[in-house]
Design a protein with these regions (language model features):
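Alpha-helical adaptor scaffolds
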Residues: 81, 107-115
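Canonical tetratricopeptide repeat
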Residues: 75-76, 108, 142, 175-176
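Short coil/turn linking the two alpha-helices of tandem helical-hairpin repeats
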Residues: 84-86, 117, 151
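Residue-level recognition of tetratricopeptide repeat
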Residues: 45, 78, 111, 145, ...
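Alpha-helical repeat scaffolds
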Residues: 56-61, 86-99, 121-131, 155-164
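Solenoidal tandem-repeat scaffolds enriched in leucines and small polar residues
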Residues: 149-179
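Sec-dependent bacterial lipoprotein signal peptides
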Residues: 1-17
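N-terminal leader/linker segments that initiate helical-solenoid repeat arrays
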Residues: 14-93, 98-104
Length: 180
């Protein structure tokens, strides 16, 4: 009995090997449009991973322009500010229409204003963020930085303490100690 079963199994194996036609699972496969999108996003993140920040910023910026997604604008703006790249003013102008919709872009715009010594605009943007109920510690820390730049150390200490109470971060602690 097993001899016949083995014979049938070998016959199927040889028939499969001798077949000249190769069957494709999906013969009508076409390249998806999202494949290009995925490749471009991964390319931008690879540039960032390998510390090629200018190329990463440019790729995120072109993704934003092609797909009009503010997450790409956030990434481009963050890379530009964190690595002191060019086009900071251009990215700030691109972010302005979305400031009321996106807190991260508003925070980055305030950081740009602080870095370019436009302290009044930075303070105005941060006050708008601080009026929200969630009181993000990043907002408190950035507002403390603005107050330090204005030389209002007493109030800056208050905001740094509030931020440190929410997130025990050594960077905030160093800023708090630096005031004393």
């Amino acid at each position: 009995m097993y001899r016949y079963l083995l014979f049938v199994l070998v016959a199927f194996f040889l028939a499969a090997c001798g077949s000249s036609k190769i069957n494709v699972v999906y013969p009508d496969y076409t390249k998806y449009k999202s494949n290009d999108f995925d490749l471009r996003v991964m390319k931008a993140y690879n540039y960032e991973y390998y510390k090629q920040y200018k190329e990463a910023r440019d790729e995120f910026l072109s993704l934003y322009q092609d797909y009009n997604n503010t997450n790409f604008l956030e990434n481009a703006f963050l890379l530009t500010l964190a690595n002191n790249l060019d086009k900071q003013a251009e990215l700030d102008n691109l972010a302005k229409p979305y400031l009321n919709q996106n807190d991260n872009l508003k925070r980055l715009s305030a950081l740009y204003a602080l870095n370019s010594n436009d302290i009044n605009n930075a303070q105005k943007l941060m006050k708008e963020l601080l009026t929200k109920k969630d009181s993000d510690p990043r907002n408190l820390e950035l507002y403390g930085d603005i107050l330090v730049k204005k030389n209002d150390l007493k109030n800056a200490t208050k905001y740094y303490r509030s931020a440190y109470n929410q997130v025990q971060n050594e960077e905030i602690l160093f800023k708090l100690i630096g005031i004393y």
